Amino acid sequence: MAKAKTSAFFCQNCGYESSKWMGQCPACREWNTFVEELVDRKALSTSGKIKPATEAKPVPLSAIKTSDEERISTSMPELDRVLGGGVVKGSLVLVGGDPGIGKSTLLLQVCRNLSGQNLSVLYVSGEESLQQIKLRAERIGTFSDHLELLCETSLDTIRTVIERNKPQIVVIDSIQTMYNENVSSAPGSVSQVRESTGVLMQIAKGMDISIFIVGHVTKEGVVAGPRVLEHMVDTVLYFEGDRHESYRILRGVKNRFGSTNEIGVFEMRTEGLVEVENPSEYMLSGKPKDASGSVVACSIEGTRPILLEIQALICHSYFNNPRRTATGTDFNRVNLLMAVLEKRIGMQLTDCDAYVNIAGGIRMNEPAIDLGIVLAIMSSKLDLTIDEKTICFGEVGLSGEVRGVSMAEQRVAEAAKLGFEVCILPKVSLPSVGKKYAMKLIGVANVREALDAIQT
């Protein structure tokens, strides 16, 4: 007879189980991800049984009706934008982020807004006491009696409370503190996180309850726990930002009910998180005047144009291997663009240290900011000042050509709205933009023409 409790090794990345430790996971091919956990085979076999569905009946696809009422507005337009228009009933939403970034504050504000709409909301905390939550809530504002708090880590107890009170919205803070009694391993382990999420998914789908799950991230910036966790939930949101800065960016990386390209911008204040309605104006605040190596570029996140400042500092290196750093964008992309400048216009950069930064702490990897990076590098290297009313966008290829990008007209419209007077853009995008905006449009076909544009 097999032992009820045995030890097994689980991959922390994908949840693969092995009877012995392995250096590389055969499922996800990651290295050094196996940890040993105690597994109760009897409990797992009992918990894994599925009750027979006596009333299960297939429904024709044409008979299923959908309506806008299935989405619940959070009264936070920035969050609704990322969610795809609001919270879908019966959805399971995972919110990840670094400790102290503001995940709990964001969801507490969501609870405040939803309970104010006479929706029953249950906030379950496994990290803070009721008194600690009350102190944080007083800083945010007044709350409705439709919001109930529960300090509990036992998933069985939480399930009993949900089945008894039948709330419409549930917040679990956090999934790493939840404990399923049918799993013998410690809270936060691979088995616990996977099984607990599975139970919450059954509750959300079976009772048509929208559930928000808070998840901590690892040092690599991904949600702690097995990768299967992100596959189980309907929506994955990452709350990004620097704890030493006031801005916060909510980014959707998975959404079964909407786009994954949208972002929401917030500002952390003493009264909580405040939405930033115009991120472009916010990102450009504090931009220095008459400084070389600084240029404004336009990027698109989903359907929203965002103007941002790209800074570059090129200086002589006193080391055999020049230092190159990139903050807010892809490091390899910066190296590629510097190689293009050396090859296509003969700009000597091999003996220079290069520092590229996207001001404001926002991270952008869209190819449309290539031209902005190139102009910032050329401006710093040649000590040229680019007029503060000039904006640019465009993708740069390996031949030095400036390629067209999507939604060029929306980018120019956003720049015109903020008072920019000159726009350097791909020449192929000029016909799509037209002459409807009171801006000087300079079309460039390659990086040589882009250099001429900032020198004149």
Regions found by a protein language model. Name each.
Residues A2-N13, E17-R81, V88-G96, I101-L108, ...:
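Peripheral, non-AAA+ core regions of ATP-driven protein-machinery
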Residues E128-S129:
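Conserved Rossmann-like nucleotide-cofactor binding loop
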